[in-house]
């Protein structure tokens, strides 16, 4: 798959949410992210398109590991975290930015240009990481925020 974020059209079931096509990590790295996850609010999708353009210009690449989660998927992720099946923190349903189609998780360790450079590009386009470290827990999680506070 080409290293782009392609907007495919509206998701009729979710207000202001669009379907996207992005390189994922599942199966063979670079395959499209599964359709059930590949959704963002329109402004976040447009911003992610710009991120991909800048990453490619910098001679890098970006793979997405997670994006939209339904309430059911979010609750399952939370239960997996609580039980220890997964180590990445996941809040209960109705408490995740993934459910609002405003969050992405990236492969922070395979970018071709370093996570610090990718973080700068993401920040430039409104994607904010919730932790300061480039290697610690949740360093892969970015939330789209249209306003800078």
Specify the residue positions occupied by each region the protein language model found.
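Sec-exported extracytoplasmic/periplasmic mature domains
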Residues: 53-57, 79-83, 123, 127
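Active-site acidic/histidine clusters and adjacent loop/turn architecture
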Residues: 9-66
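Substrate-binding cleft of extracellular glycoside hydrolase catalytic domains
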Residues: 3, 75-88
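Catalytic cores and adjacent binding grooves of peptidoglycan-active enzymes
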Residues: 84-149
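N-terminal secretory targeting signals
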Residues: 1-9
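Stable alpha-helical elements in mature extracytoplasmic
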Residues: 40, 44-51, 73, 77, ...
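Acidic helix-start/capping segments at beta-turn-to-alpha-helix junctions
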Residues: 63-78
């Amino acid at each position: 798959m080409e290293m782009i974020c392609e907007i495919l059209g509206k998701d009729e079931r979710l207000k202001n949410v669009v379907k996207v096509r992005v390189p994922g990590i599942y199966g063979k790295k670079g395959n499209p992210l599964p359709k059930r996850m590949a959704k963002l609010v329109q402004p976040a999708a447009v911003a992610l398109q710009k991120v991909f353009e800048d990453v490619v210009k910098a001679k890098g690449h970006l793979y997405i590991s997670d994006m939209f989660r339904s309430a059911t998927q979010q609750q399952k992720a939370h239960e997996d975290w609580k039980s220890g099946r997964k180590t990445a923190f996941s809040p209960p349903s109705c408490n995740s930015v993934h459910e609002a189609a405003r969050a992405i998780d990236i492969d922070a360790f395979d970018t071709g240009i370093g996570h610090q450079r990718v973080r700068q590009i993401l920040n430039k386009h409104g994607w904010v990481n919730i932790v300061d470290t480039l290697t610690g827990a949740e360093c892969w999680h970015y939330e789209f925020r249209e306003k800078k506070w």
